[in-house]
Amino acid sequence: GLKWLNSHDSSIWQGWTQLPESGVELIITKSLKDVMALATITRTPAIALQSENTKPKKAIVEELKSRFKSIYILYDNDFDKEINVGRIMGKEMVEHFDNYAVQIEIPEKFKSKDFSDLVMNIGPVEAEIALIDLKVPF
């Protein structure tokens, strides 16, 4: 249905206005709910485009690379689907960032496709610990 319908065009980043001028880490994720969960629970700056299919303009890529020492791509782990679209789109985003970004993924053992699901399934403290462990690329 229309649950997540909005009038934003594909160039709008969710969470952009909350980003610091610079920082150690940035997480690019798939949805506003994950941006909010990451920012609230981990205090890690996070942003999301309107969909996993959208790619940022090269000027934005260069700006983010200059502002953040490490950029992580945390898209959905569609572990329960025949084709893991989140993994494929995450890999494409890493390539779009000229391999400056690192793709991380919530392990299948958690049965959680995204960070907000992980928080719901194992709790905020455990989810934050799991995220720290994820920053070693899979």
Predicted regions, residues:
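Phosphate-handling DNA/RNA-contact segment within nucleic-acid enzymes
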Residues: 1-67, 85
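A structural signal for isolated positions on well-ordered beta-strands in alpha/beta enzyme cores
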Residues: 26, 70-72, 102-103
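Alpha-helical scaffold elements adjacent to nucleotide-binding pockets in ATP/GTP-utilizing enzyme cores
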Residues: 88-96, 114, 118
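A structural-propensity feature for long, helix-poor, extended segments
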Residues: 64-77
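Structural alpha-beta junctions
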Residues: 44-45, 91-104
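Short, small/acidic-rich helices and loops at N termini and domain boundaries
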Residues: 110-138
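Acidic, metal-coordinating catalytic cores used for nucleic-acid/nucleotide bond scission
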Residues: 33, 53-56, 75-90, 108-110
